[in-house]
From Swiss-Prot:
GO molecular function, one term: triose-phosphate isomerase activity
Compartments where found: Cytoplasm
Active site: H99 (electrophile), E169 (proton acceptor)
Pathway per the UniProt entry: Carbohydrate biosynthesis; gluconeogenesis; Carbohydrate degradation; glycolysis; D-glyceraldehyde 3-phosphate from glycerone phosphate: step 1/1
Summary of the function given for this chain in its UniProt record: Involved in the gluconeogenesis. Catalyzes stereospecifically the conversion of dihydroxyacetone phosphate (DHAP) to D-glyceraldehyde-3-phosphate (G3P).
Catalytic activity: D-glyceraldehyde 3-phosphate = dihydroxyacetone phosphate
Enzyme superclass (EC): isomerase
Protein residues bound to substrate: N12, W13, K14, G175, S214, G235, G236
Recorded superkingdom: Bacteria
Similarity comment text for this entry: Belongs to the triosephosphate isomerase family.
Keyword Cytoplasm found: yes
Protein EC: 5.3.1.1
UniProt-recorded name of the protein: Triosephosphate isomerase
Length: 256
């Protein structure tokens, strides 16, 4: 954790969820309540088909709703895409950009991720910018070089602690059940913090740094308690309200 920084626990549903899944969002919304909600923010990013309905379910809850991606342009002939403005119009407040699955499956570059983050800023959304190394890069000892490059190229100059969250997701840990050691996570997050402070000063100190990659109730307390880890970006474990809330409530002990 980082002193004076409000943590964020975010769920990325990826390409999962139909209208029947709204019961899980409703249960999460009912479980995100003060006093913990005053100290720790919670967010679910469902598929776009559920975005507007999900925000309607959360009008009386502190639970935030966001999207999983946006186009870099505000409108136009981009079949199948969604703009940041459309997300905001559906009352979403966050958008994930640069997730490794987008970088890999859709060949998204750091330059494109940066443009998407800038589009999010223009629509007054908070961008969750994802970075992380592959297994091959890690074996070659290049993980910090990759983090440095992606932070430099993917994060816009206009980034602030209010409009930007950084999510470190080592690609080899996503959906594999394999989690880096606490020391590995601490090293990566300390490096990110130093890079952000060097570039953005106090804004860099206050930016939230999330860890993602096989986060589950059993390891949440350990991961969320690491220095400079200001929350989590959760995949599969966010699909069930009980699992997501168990991770979220790990902060009850950490903040006691």
């Amino acid at each position: 954790m980082t002193p004076d920084v409000r943590p964020l626990v975010a769920g990325n549903w990826k390409m999962n969820g139909t209208r029947a899944s709204l019961d899980q969002i409703k249960a999460i919304a009912e479980g995100v309540r003060p006093p913990l909600a005053d100290k720790v923010e919670a967010l679910i990013c469902p598929p776009t088909t559920l975005l507007y309905v999900a925000t309607a379910l959360c009008t009386d809850s502190p639970l935030a709703i966001g999207a999983q991606d946006c186009h870099q342009k505000p409108s136009g002939a981009h079949t199948g895409d969604i703009s940041a403005e459309m997300i905001a119009d559906s009352f979403g407040t966050y958008v994930i950009v640069g997730h490794s699955e987008r970088r890999t499956d859709h060949a998204e570059t750091d330059h494109l991720v940066r443009a998407k983050a800038e589009a999010a800023f223009a629509a007054e959304l908070t961008a969750i910018i994802c970075i992380g190394e592959t297994a091959d890069e890690r074996r070659a000892g290049q993980e910090l070089d990759v983090i440095k490059r992606q932070l430099s190229a993917s994060v816009p100059d206009a980034a602030t602690a209010e409009n930007t969250v950084i999510a470190y997701e080592p690609i080899w840990a996503i959906g594999t059940g394999v989690t880096p050691t606490s020391g590995d996570v601490e090293k990566a997050h300390a490096f990110m913090r130093a890079e952000l402070v060097s570039r953005f000063g106090d804004e860099g100190r206050k930016m939230r740094l999330l860890y993602g990659g096989s986060v589950k109730p059993a390891n949440a307390g350990e991961l969320l308690g690491i220095a400079n880890v200001d929350g989590a970006l959760i995949g599969g474990a966010s699909l069930k309200a009980a699992d997501f809330l168990a991770i979220y409530r790990a902060y009850e002990a950490l903040l006691a």
